[in-house]
Amino acid sequence: MIKPKLLVIGHGRHGKDTVCEILRDHYGYTFESSSKFCSLQFIYNDLKEKYGYANEEECYADRHNHRAEWYNAICDYNVPDAATLGREMFAAYDIYCGLRNKREYYAMKNTGVFDKVIWVDRSDHLPPESNDSMSLEPWMADYIIDNNGTLGDLAFNVGQLINYINPYDTAQC
């Protein structure tokens, strides 16, 4: 059975990468953080001189200090076709982890780039991200995963959801 293409979204540091790691490690999905993908593709080259980064890893590690700048760089990358990055991500991986722009979301949704959208919520512990680096909202997702408990709770919640989304292909690897 073919795995559905999953778009995993949510506010910064709410657990998107952790959800994707669970999907990779236990359910055979592939993913790369969109921030890492973009850092490797173009952001490091665009910012290395401005911030004096020695290498791509240093640029990627510093991304939280420049959220709005990264957001705008990714928006610019997706002109004129707002679904460009999404198509590139899904050509290489089963999951696109970390989309933040509603224009790109709508472009991908309207062209069938992804199958399902999962919002990761940790709002009981962390604030929402600023609007200058995040324009998506929970209502845009097909499903919401609660990440307000323990890591074990999160793994259980991911398992329940993936068994519902793809019940015939969820044997743990």
Which role does the model predict for each range below?
Residues 8-10, 96:
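Hydrophobic anchor at the beta1->P-loop junction of P-loop NTPases
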Residues 14:
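ATP-binding Walker
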Residues 25-32:
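Post-Walker A helix-loop "phosphate-sensing" segment adjacent to the P-loop in P-loop NTPases
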Residues 34-94, 100:
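ATP-dependent small-molecule kinase phosphotransfer cores
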Residues 86-135:
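ATP-dependent NMP and nucleoside kinases share a basic, alpha-helical "lid"
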Residues 116-160, 164-167:
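Conserved catalytic-core segment of NTP-binding enzymes
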